[in-house]
């Protein structure tokens, strides 16, 4: 069993299980996303994980996205703490086709995740700082 939280230490096993891996420097993309964001995405639920996160991954794999996405969740702080931050903001996406075939890939183009509500002062300030960044 692969420990997804530390997937970068299990590359051989992931490849053996036909899990598609990022084709870019994950650490650099995440660093740049926090330092100089170019994409803030509001809503970290299933649509992001199944659709928008995959678009970001494809763009990063092609070299067209240099800085990772910052996900701003407004509904539930546990989406951020348990669903994103517990896994270093990475996503294991599994798509099942009608014939039963599974496409599995690690989406690692999310640089940061923030619970953004006024009552969460730390998260709110962080999102404001991202919006004030000239790169955005």
Regions found by a protein language model. Give the residues of each.
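Non-transmembrane, aqueous-exposed alpha-helical and coiled segments at domain scale
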Residues: 1-136
């Amino acid at each position: 069993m692969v420990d997804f939280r530390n997937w970068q230490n299990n590359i051989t096993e992931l490849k053996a299980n036909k899990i598609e891996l990022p084709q870019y420097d994950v650490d650099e993309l995440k660093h740049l996303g926090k330092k100089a964001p170019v994409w803030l995405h509001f809503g970290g639920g299933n649509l992001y994980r199944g659709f928008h996160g995959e678009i970001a991954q494809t763009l990063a794999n092609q070299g067209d996205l240099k800085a990772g996405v910052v996900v701003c969740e407004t509904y539930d702080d546990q989406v951020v703490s348990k669903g994103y931050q517990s896994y270093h903001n990475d996503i294991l996406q599994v798509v099942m086709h009608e014939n039963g075939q599974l496409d599995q890939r690690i989406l690692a183009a999310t640089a940061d995740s923030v619970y953004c509500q006024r009552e969460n002062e730390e998260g709110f300030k962080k999102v404001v700082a991202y919006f004030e960044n000239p790169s955005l």
